[in-house]
Amino acid sequence: MASEQAAESYTVEELVAVNPYNPDILNDLEGFVNDQVSNQTYNLDANLSLLRLYQFEPERLSVQIVSRILIKALMAMPGPDFSLCLFLIPEHVQMEEQFKTLIVLSHYLETARFRQFWDEASKNRNILDVVPGFEQAIQSYAIHVLSLTYQKVPRPVLAEAINIEGLALDKFLEHHIANSGWVIEKGARSQLIVLPRNEFNHPELKKNTAETVPFEHVTRIFPVLS
């Protein structure tokens, strides 16, 4: 009883930091996953801790909770979170249909096959809709990928990548013009969306490494070389 009262005085993050392998916190971690879903927050360390505990106590594994963890991990792309989580999930669990679907979706995102991703996602709304913000997170990831390649994105390419068309796309563009520095140009066949400059779509912005080393760091190297 005393230990339970002591545990209640700590946050889930603190419990994980103190002893991530404590099976007594498994229920707390499951509740924390549901909190992340409802509050649209995210804590990879806590979720990994829960998946490790499931390895030690497989009979307590909740398929619903694991599914939510993987969906939240997909939303964290381009981070490696999905792979980190999947590594801790037993193969026989991965063979369940909903997990095979999430693995396919992950592959489409990693290879920037956005049309295939949205087609597959539309067939599995029952899995994905339980996690608010999923669609918006993937749209942000798609824009990130486009910004690594394009200086100017044709409107149809953007529409396919984020799965938005028509008036909804017009409103989406208006928002990013006002808040993200996007600019619209007229192209020969369609609108072009000019994305903010970065070192990937404008390589000239990427400075030579030598140019970015402060002089005081260079002077510290000389005694070592001599």
Swiss-Prot record:
Gene3D superfamilies: ARM repeat, domain 1, Winged helix-like DNA-binding domain superfamily/Winged helix DNA-binding domain. One of its GO terms (molecular function) is RNA binding. PROSITE patterns: PCI. Residues 42-200 form the PCI domain. InterPro entries: ARM-type_fold, CSN8_PSD8_EIF3K, eIF3k, PCI_dom, Transl_init_fac_sub12_N_euk, WH-like_DNA-bd_sf, WH_DNA-bd_sf. Keywords: Cytoplasm, Initiation factor, Protein biosynthesis. GO terms for biological process: formation of cytoplasmic translation initiation complex; regulation of translational initiation. GO terms for cellular component: eukaryotic 43S preinitiation complex; eukaryotic 48S preinitiation complex; eukaryotic translation initiation factor 3 complex. SUPFAM superfamilies: ARM repeat (SSF48371), Winged helix' DNA-binding domain (SSF46785). The keyword Cytoplasm applies. It is found in: Cytoplasm. Component of the eukaryotic translation initiation factor 3 (eIF-3) complex. Component of the eukaryotic translation initiation factor 3 (eIF-3) complex, which is involved in protein synthesis of a specialized repertoire of mRNAs and, together with other initiation factors, stimulates binding of mRNA and methionyl-tRNAi to the 40S ribosome. The eIF-3 complex specifically targets and initiates translation of a subset of mRNAs involved in cell proliferation. Belongs to the eIF-3 subunit K family. This is Eukaryotic translation initiation factor 3 subunit K. It comes from Oryza sativa subsp. japonica. The lineage of its organism: Eukaryota, Viridiplantae, Streptophyta, Embryophyta, Tracheophyta. The gene is TIF3K1.
